[in-house]
Amino acid sequence: MEKLVIGSRGSELALWQANHIKERLKKECSMESEIRIVKTTGDKILDAPLNKIGGKGLFTKELEELLLKGAIDLAVHSLKDVPVVFEKGLDLACITKRADVRDTFLSVKFPDLMSLPKGAKVGTTSLRRSMQIKFKRKDLDTESLRGNVQTRLKKLECGEFDAIILAEAGLCRLNVQGAKYRKAFSVKEMIPSMGQGALGVEMLKNHKHFITLQKLNNEESAFCCHLEREFIKGLNGGCQIPIGVHANLMGDEVKIRAVLGLPNGKEVIAKEKQGDKTKAFDLVQELLEEFLQSGAKEILEKAQLF
């Protein structure tokens, strides 16, 4: 029997995601598969903030190269890590149903962000999170926090940080409590990254099983995630820049929230649009235009200097 080869990063969370797709392939597509672990640039360089490593696709490039060579059949990604422009010949075969999209505050001593003392050290890998934290609390010190989920939690428990921010979806998937204090931000309090909470399965567009994999697609999640990706694409952005965007369907309407700014919490633009879901992509373009008129491009150019 033919076995599909699934490419995956080697972290516990990445392997959970790959095994999730493996199980669904068997159950819903009657297809056997095996997992091949691949180290990406983002996995190899752990002593520098992600935005300092440079380039797009820090967690996807090596997987995409193997897809193009035919060495793997599909790659399973956290959708938030997937660049909005694909290498020629590649595309997303499916986007899974979203898990919890929220970001979560974790601390050993403090119940929430507002209870942190002045000068407290908050760990995060994300300029987007850092920007929104500093916008709320300019007196806090945000510092780069690299490593897998367990490594980050150990650094918190050892006292290297007063608090850390992680994706709620990752904590839930690994069934991790995290710390004494754990509080998820609402989407309004901290706008997530594009595609946060969803998995993206990438393949060659001409792969014989590309259409088959679309059985794993969740229509609502895919619709919202494509709106978010369209917004990022319009700003020529990537996953390592301080932009948050979240689209949410509410019956026949869609609400799109977005934020961008400097990592130090200055010069922040935050806007939202709501309207008929049949005109959702027009809403994205309107939102983009408002951001551009408010100086979004100039702010993002400045953000690259941080």
UniProtKB/Swiss-Prot annotation:
- Protein name per UniProt: Porphobilinogen deaminase
Regarding protein family, the annotation reads: Belongs to the HMBS family.
Q: Which UniProt keywords apply?
A: Porphyrin biosynthesis, Transferase
The record's HAMAP family line, in alphabetical order, gives:
Porphobil_deam
Which GO CC annotations does the UniProt entry carry? cytoplasm
* Keyword Transferase among UniProt keywords: yes
Q: Which reaction does it catalyse?
A: 4 porphobilinogen + H2O = hydroxymethylbilane + 4 NH4(+)
Which Gene3D superfamilies does the annotation name?
A: Periplasmic binding protein-like II, Porphobilinogen deaminase, C-terminal domain
Cofactor note (record): Binds 1 dipyrromethane group covalently.
Q: Which GO terms describe its molecular function?
A: hydroxymethylbilane synthase activity
What SUPFAM superfamilies does UniProt report for this protein, alphabetically?
Periplasmic binding protein-like II, Porphobilinogen deaminase (hydroxymethylbilane synthase), C-terminal domain
- Give the Enzyme Commission number: 2.5.1.61
Pathway(s) this gene product operates in, as recorded in its UniProt entry: Porphyrin-containing compound metabolism; protoporphyrin-IX biosynthesis; coproporphyrinogen-III from 5-aminolevulinate: step 2/4
- Source domain of life is Bacteria
Query: What is the main EC category here?
Result: transferase
